[in-house]
Amino acid sequence: MKLKAKYKQQSKVGKVVQVVSAVVDVSFAGKDLPHILNALECTINNEKIVLEVLQHIGDDIVRCLAMNSTDGLFRGAEVIDTGEQIKVPVGKSILGRILNVVGQPIDDLGPIKCDNFSQIHKDAPKFINQSTSRKILITGIKVIDLLTPYISGGKIGLFGGAGVGKTVLIMEIINNVAKAYKGYTVFTGVGERTREGGDLYKEMVGSNIIDLNKLENSKVTLVFGQMNEPPGARARVALTGLTIAESFRDMNEGEVLLFIDNIFRFTQAGAEISTLLGRIPSAVGYQPTLATDIGSLQERITSTKFGAITSIQAIYVPADDLTDPAPVACFAHLDATTVLSRKIAELGIYPAVDPLNSSSQILDANVIGQEHYSVATQVQEILQTYKSLQDVIAILGVDELSDDEKRIVSRARKIQRFLTQPFHVAEVFTGKQGRFVSLEDTIYGFKGLIEGKYDDLPEMAFYMVGSIDEAIEKSKTL
């Protein structure tokens, strides 16, 4: 009866006729069915279950996707059509809060007082309203700033298999960029570990990005649909986080940072839903609508004349296969890609970024400057030459190389080690204080390496240091 009172405006009332995991069929009398993507609500044991209409089946049945657990749901349960799509609170009232997929707070800080709500399904901004930026976003991480510079207002993907450091890297970027950032930040946890979300929240409270005493002074909103949640939550929570980021962008108060960890779980949830709906799977078992699902999300992550969204997304690579359809569907949408390699991680090189597989659209002399471009391309050439010589070294040994090749190998190994860096978020594991390296120091250090200024220093002097001055000091202790 409470639900009926809430939706007086000719609400449609239906009955549950079938429950199959997260997919629920609801029957409505008459032929006036709820629209596709409408939100339906059902209360079981004082818990509200939110359903989203996906299909019309026959004359009187709609097939829905549950946003939360269907435990306790039964045939005959009463369902109310809200008459609108899922809407979530937006604006400054949600700063410092943790929300779930339907915009409910899950941080035990009480209800959210908000008058502004926005639906999670939207079209991308019109082309005439979009804007582009060619400005570099400084992360303080040498390998990224030098070889795969990130675009302010662009889309960035961190690709990698299990356990190679995607989450640690995204946490370090949050630490280096979001803490010093004047705009707003939205972190969206999609199908990842609840523990990591808790650690991130505590870190943000500790660094005062979230001000528990005065939440409106906070600079971040967190949205979680973690791996223990139904596929409906994991498939829609990225849209919830994006909707909140869009609202901050359209407030015209500067750039917005949007972190998503992990886009693959969004794809994975879509595959689960597709199977439950009985669709014929495509390659490797993914949903036949894979490209559409990814495209509808990615095309909304864009900058407009009102403001910019800079998106940094972690993307899991199944079995370390970059040709898997899920990561392949993401590549075309991104402005910069950072590929993490297990082979590099096995060498103890952290962050385990593959400098030859990673790329950026703004690695261009007209954008980043001639000196930066020249140093970056020479570093890549040296590393590529070293890679091509590795088979010869493995069979014949270093002694069979020419003097020039030996010099290149020596510099390449030093460059490889100088690309490492101690992270602030990993201090508890490494015991080493994190380093933020300015772009000027990064270019200066690598320029000296490729010119041979530091040929006399041992390789280990360059391992896990910040600037080149630190490497010189370290060499004195070896």
Curated annotation (Swiss-Prot):
GO terms for cellular component: plasma membrane; proton-transporting ATP synthase complex. ATP binds at residues 160-167. Its main location: membrane. PROSITE patterns: ATPASE_ALPHA_BETA. It is a peripheral membrane protein. Keywords: ATP synthesis, ATP-binding, Cell inner membrane, Cell membrane, CF(1), Hydrogen ion transport, Ion transport, Membrane, Nucleotide-binding, Translocase, Transport. It comes from the Bacteria. The keyword RNA-binding does not apply. It holds the Pfam family ATP-synt_VA_C. One of its GO terms (molecular function) is ATP hydrolysis activity. It catalyses: ATP + H2O + 4 H(+)(in) = ADP + phosphate + 5 H(+)(out). Its EC number is 7.1.2.2. It is found in: Cell inner membrane. InterPro entries: AAA+_ATPase, ATP-synt_VA_C, ATP_synth_F1_bsu, ATPase_a/bsu_AS, ATPase_alpha/beta_chains, ATPase_F1/V1/A1_a/bsu_N, ATPase_F1/V1/A1_a/bsu_N_sf, ATPase_F1/V1/A1_a/bsu_nucl-bd. Signal peptide: none annotated. Belongs to the ATPase alpha/beta chains family. F-type ATPases have 2 components, CF(1) - the catalytic core - and CF(0) - the membrane proton channel. CF(1) has five subunits: alpha(3), beta(3), gamma(1), delta(1), epsilon(1). CF(0) has three main subunits: a(1), b(2) and c(9-12). The alpha and beta chains form an alternating ring which encloses part of the gamma chain. CF(1) is attached to CF(0) by a central stalk formed by the gamma and epsilon chains, while a peripheral stalk is formed by the delta and b chains. Produces ATP from ADP in the presence of a proton gradient across the membrane. The catalytic sites are hosted primarily by the beta subunits. This is ATP synthase subunit beta. It comes from Orientia tsutsugamushi (strain Boryong) (Rickettsia tsutsugamushi). The gene is atpD.
